[in-house]
């Protein structure tokens, strides 16, 4: 998904174009990580000083409903990112320190299906959490300094 595809999808579903919506979508396009509503508000606050959490959440929910954004939850907080445009099946590693994601090509369901004989699986989501190499290196530098 990219910004133009997302804007077209909004238009096709009867939602009007606004600079605010485009800027919010651009924020996700420029990020390789999951973002919280607070991240979005902080990033857009200078350009839109009266922007509220309600407006942010309403748009994030709309984007999720239309399949523009995908979500995950960490420590009880919902995080958002552009829906992957990859056409192949994959999963993600998510850095708990910075939110950056890395695509994982292999799928554990390939091995688990044998254990689910007779069950009809309708879908699955697999995420691995930890610390990315950049954050690990930064953490090691901070502890040795």
From Swiss-Prot:
One of its GO terms (biological process) is regulation of secondary metabolite biosynthetic process. Changing residue 90 to A: Decrease in repressor activity. It comes from Bacillus subtilis (strain 168). Sequentially activated from an inactive dimer (Zur(2):Zn(2)) to a partially active asymmetric dimer (Zur(2):Zn(3)), and finally to the fully zinc-loaded active form (Zur(2):Zn(4)). Binds a maximum of 4 Zn(2+) ions per dimer. It is found in: Cytoplasm. The gene is zur. Changing residue 132 to S: Strong decrease in repressor activity. Its main location: cytoplasm. It comes from the Bacteria. Contains 3 zinc-binding sites. Site 1 has a structural role and site 2 is the Zn(2+) sensing site. Site 3 residues do not bind metal ions with a physiologically relevant affinity, but contribute to dimer stability. Keywords: Cytoplasm, DNA-binding, Metal-binding, Repressor, Transcription, Transcription regulation, Zinc. Belongs to the Fur family. The keyword Repressor applies. CDD domains: Fur_like (cd07153). This is Zinc-specific metallo-regulatory protein.
């Amino acid at each position: 998904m990219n910004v133009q595809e997302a804007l077209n999808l909004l238009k096709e579903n009867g939602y009007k174009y606004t600079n605010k919506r485009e800027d919010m979508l651009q924020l996700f396009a420029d990020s390789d990580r999951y973002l919280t509503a607070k991240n979005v508000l902080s990033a857009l606050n200078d350009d839109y000083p009266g922007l509220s959490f309600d407006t942010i959440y309403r748009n994030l929910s709309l984007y999720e409903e239309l399949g523009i954004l995908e979500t995950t939850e960490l420590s009880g907080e919902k995080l958002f990112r552009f829906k992957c445009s990859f056409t192949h099946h994959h999963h993600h590693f998510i850095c708990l320190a910075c939110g950056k994601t890395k695509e994982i090509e292999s799928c554990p369901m390939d091995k688990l299906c044998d254990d689910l004989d007779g069950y009809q699986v309708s879908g699955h989501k697999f995420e691995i959490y930890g610390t990315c190499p950049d954050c690990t290196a930064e953490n090691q530098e901070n502890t040795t300094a």
